[in-house]
């Protein structure tokens, strides 16, 4: 039987294994946000707050399409991890091939759709007229490179599903550094403005995606076995997990677009402040997302290997990591929120922009712990393949956030856009945890565990 050096998720002590696995993913999330924030910081400093607002206005919409990629990767990743843990490498490679072919086609279709309807979508979001043209330009360049972004996210999920989180980190560092230098050259040097920022991101992401694909192909040569290039039945099994995850992630992002539409009427400066803190929220939230993404393959691999006793220990290890990072987030935001806001808003930012950014940021800092425990619990549910309560919990989270923003913010002020966020996280956790307590497999379940569906 083939043995793999990546099997530490099913052999090492749970806290050690999860920490070793999660840390590159956390660092990767940090560099992913540097990669994203480079556009905002450089545009804000060298072009102005209106250009920053144009880039920020695109964030909620681009997140919808990114979440489709991430959700699609979840379906493939859970099954790849399960077969990897069971050492059924033929099925594992069939899932990999089937998902890459299917999602490449999907990414091209989504890119064409996004490019053609960029103006219509930004108009529906009530984007302020003074930044609409720049926002549409940024968005269209983004969609030209969308297949690269989509496939890079799928490949990153594939790497982590087999216990490899270092290669995505190295590629992210490379693309982040490249993106920053190209941003400075195209925006500050050549004066290309929003177009230059978008083009720099496209080129850096494209190079990273190509390298990811070549390295992953080489990595798969380690597992010498027969497999099918495309299997409709495995695609169906994958979609049973992927579709709820895509619905959850894309619906939440659509909800954020609706929230953005609530913010937009408050004006360009309020939008600039909101956009600045959204970037900061993404930095810290992706730390917790990374821990949740790390626990999913841990759970799935150990389930495939029928090591039931390790599941709860892994969940507890994830909670420990979440608590540590929640405390760190609070300390950083409480101490440096003004300086962080100035990175994005620059000298052109008004008092309103700084107030919106600071108030939103400090409120989040108090309650990131709720996001952390929510993400860990959701990650365990994904690893077990229990998607219905996972979807319901996230929809409740979204409903709370949307209802308060839509009803209260227009009447009582922009602060109500973010006041309900922690309540949504907490409700999500409670629903997910209740479902998890009912669904934990035990030692008596070993014989009934299937690699296709738990």
Locate predicted features.
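Short alpha-helical transmembrane segments in multi-pass integral membrane proteins
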Residues: 1-22, 80-145, 189-243, 299-366, ...
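Residue-level signal for short hydrophobic patches within transmembrane helices
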Residues: 11, 15-34, 38, 61-68, ...
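Interfacial/gating helices of multi-pass transporter permease domains
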Residues: 20, 43-63, 129-134, 194-195, ...
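Helix-terminus/linker motif at the lipid-water interface of multi-pass membrane proteins
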Residues: 30, 34-52, 122-129, 185-192, ...
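Transmembrane helical elements of multi-pass membrane transporters/channels
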Residues: 20-39, 141, 175, 204-208, ...
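Short runs within selected transmembrane alpha-helices of multi-pass transporters and secretion channels
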Residues: 73, 142-160, 168-176, 197-210, ...
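Hydrophobic transmembrane alpha-helices of multi-pass small-molecule transporters
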Residues: 64-67, 179-183, 208-213, 283-286, ...
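Small-residue-rich hydrophobic transmembrane alpha-helices
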Residues: 52-112, 149-168, 273-337, 371-385, ...
């Amino acid at each position: 039987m083939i043995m793999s050096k990546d099997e530490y998720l099913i052999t090492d002590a749970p806290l050690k294994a999860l920490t070793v696995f999660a840390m590159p993913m956390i660092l990767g999330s940090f560099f992913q946000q540097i990669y994203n924030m480079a556009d905002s910081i450089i545009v804000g400093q060298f072009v102005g707050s209106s250009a920053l607002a144009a880039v920020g206005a695109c964030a909620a919409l681009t997140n919808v399409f990114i979440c489709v990629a991430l959700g699609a990767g979840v379906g493939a990743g859970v099954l790849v991890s399960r077969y990897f843990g069971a050492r059924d490498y033929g099925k594992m490679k069939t899932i990999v091939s089937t998902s890459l072919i299917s999602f490449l086609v999907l990414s091209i279709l989504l890119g064409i759709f996004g490019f053609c309807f960029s103006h219509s979508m930004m108009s529906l979001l009530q984007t302020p007229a003074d930044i609409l043209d720049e926002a549409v330009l940024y968005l269209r360049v983004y969609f030209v490179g969308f297949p690269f972004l989509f496939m890079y996210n799928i490949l990153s999920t594939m790497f982590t599903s087999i216990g490899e989180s270092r290669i995505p980190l190295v590629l992210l560092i490379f693309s982040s550094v490249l993106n920053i230098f190209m941003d400075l050259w195209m925006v500050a040097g050549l004066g290309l403005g929003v177009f230059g920022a978008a083009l720099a991101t496209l080129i850096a992401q494209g190079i990273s995606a190509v390298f990811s694909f070549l390295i992953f192909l080489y990595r798969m040569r380690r597992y010498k076995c027969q497999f099918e290039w495309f299997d409709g039945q495995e695609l169906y099994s994958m979609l049973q997990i992927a579709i709820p995850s895509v619905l959850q992630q894309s619906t939440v992002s659509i909800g954020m677009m609706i929230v953005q539409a609530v913010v937009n009427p408050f004006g360009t400066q309020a939008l600039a402040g909101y956009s600045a803190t959204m970037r900061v929220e993404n930095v810290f939230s992706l730390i917790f997302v990374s821990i949740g993404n790390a626990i999913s393959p841990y759970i799935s691999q150990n389930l495939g290997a029928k090591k039931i006793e390790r599941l709860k220990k892994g969940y507890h290890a994830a909670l420990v990591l979440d608590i540590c990072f929640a405390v760190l987030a609070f300390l950083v935001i409480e101490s440096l929120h003004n300086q962080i806001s100035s990175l994005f808003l620059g000298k052109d930012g008004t008092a309103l922009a700084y107030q919106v950014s600071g108030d939103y940021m400090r409120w989040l800092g108090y309650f990131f712990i709720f996001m952390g425990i929510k993400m860990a619990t959701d990650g365990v549910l994904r690893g077990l393949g229990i998607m219905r309560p996972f979807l319901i919990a996230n929809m409740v989270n979204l409903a709370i956030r949307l209802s308060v923003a839509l009803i209260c913010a227009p009447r009582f002020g922009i602060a109500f856009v973010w006041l309900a966020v922690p309540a949504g996280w907490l409700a999500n956790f409670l629903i997910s945890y209740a479902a998890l307590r009912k669904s934990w497999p035990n030692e008596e379940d070993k014989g009934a565990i299937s690699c296709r569906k738990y």
